[in-house]
Structures are given as C-alpha cells and as structure tokens.
Amino acid sequence: MFEDMDPYVILLIFVAVILAVSLVAAFLPRMMKLDMRQIHLMVALSAGIFLGILFFMLLPETFEEAHEGGAGAMDPVLWIVGGFLVVLFVDVIVKRMHMNKCACEECDDKDHLHEVTSLTAFIGLAIHAVVDGLVIALAIGHGEALAAVVLVGISLHKFADVFALSSIFTLTKIEKKKTLVFMIAFILITPVAAILSMPVVDILEDFAIFIPLAVATGIFMYVGIYSLLPEAFHERRDSLKSLAIVVAGIVAIALIAILLGDAHGH
C-alpha cells in the first residue's frame, strides 16, 4: 500500500484520513438530532466499539510487538497498567478539584455529572491521542506493512474516540461554541503529535513500539470501561437495548479484526 513512498507523504495520507474520519465522527451526533435516550444508546455503541478495539486490536498488537521486540511477558502488562493508572490519577484529581468548587446540591445533578464525565473523558482521550501520534510516526518508521495496519486501526478507534466524545458533550449543557473548541482541539492532537514526532523517528528507531501501544491500551481500557460503559447504561429502562448494542459493537470490531488479520496474513 505504501511501498516506495516518502515517509512524509505517508504521514500526509495518515493526517488527511484521520482528519476526515474525525470530522465525520464529530458532527454525526449533532446532525442526527437525537434525544437523551438515543444519545445514551449511541454512547453504548461507542463503548462496544471501544471494547472491541481494545480486545481484538490493541491488546493483540501490543503483545505481538512486545514478543517480536524480545520483551518479557510482563513488560507490556506493566506499561498497560501504567497507562491505566495515569488516567485514573488525572481523573480522580480533576473530579476532586471540580467537586470542591460546586455546591453540594449540584454534585448529584445529572447535567453536572455529565459535565464532569465529559471533562475526564476528554483528558483521558487527549492523552491517548498524543500517544497515537507517536505510534503513527514510529509505525511509518518501522515499515509499510505495519503502517498500513496502524492506519486502519487508528482510523477505526479515532472514529470511536471522537464519536463518543461528541456524544457525551451533547449530554451536557456546555455552550456549543465551547464544545466546538474542545472537539477541534481534540481532533488536531493526533496529527500534530505525529508531525512533531516524525523528525525524531530516526533517533527512536530502536525504541520499542510496544511501549506507546501498551500505554495507549491502558488509557483506552480506562476510558472505555470506566467512562463510557457506565454512561451507556445510564438509562436503566434501556439497559437490555444498551447491552445488545454494546455486544453488537464488540462483534463488529471482532469481524473487522478477523478480516484485517486475514488480509495482513496474505
């Protein structure tokens, strides 16, 4: 797919694809004019896609790269836990600071809780987006085959990232202009991080790519399980629908992963 291409041309293709995917994902929830129940079902779909990407793409790719790089069995596990704990720490601090500022009667208000959830999800996914940029630069430096797989994988979970974040923001009463600024900033993080990482790829050519992959996996795990799943089941009357949609999202990504695996194998 990328044979004999200049690395910076490949990078431009990555940036163009990721920006296009991100813009579509950002505006879909707003264009569909959904009510609260439907938005929560969309978050359920995002959660399913997140979990599918986590279990069928990020985890296998992380352990495969660790094995090929000669790392020990526990090395990727430690980095995954590290990524998870970093976002957990940030989440706890942000919520603590935010709750200290609010009036007691506001803290249990649904709109207020949605605002806090959107903020912590943004922070977690922003950290993940920076790591994605580094992974893109390293993948391009490691060869065309890995770059193609990473492009498909990151495009898929970038769609899930942006769609989920945009859906969560629609649940809040934050001003549209402010949420638009947040979304534009988030969409630009990965391309900017990739561009800034490219000049140092040669310096990092012996850098173990499984490390940023593992950190990204830990962050993805936290946001998917801790932020999105609870929000997906927020409407108890739709719990069975949400469950079915989460499972459908997981199965869809599993099928895509199988197809990509077959294509990569050939």
Each model region followed by its residue ranges:
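Intrinsically disordered, metal-sensing/regulatory segments
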Residues: 1-266
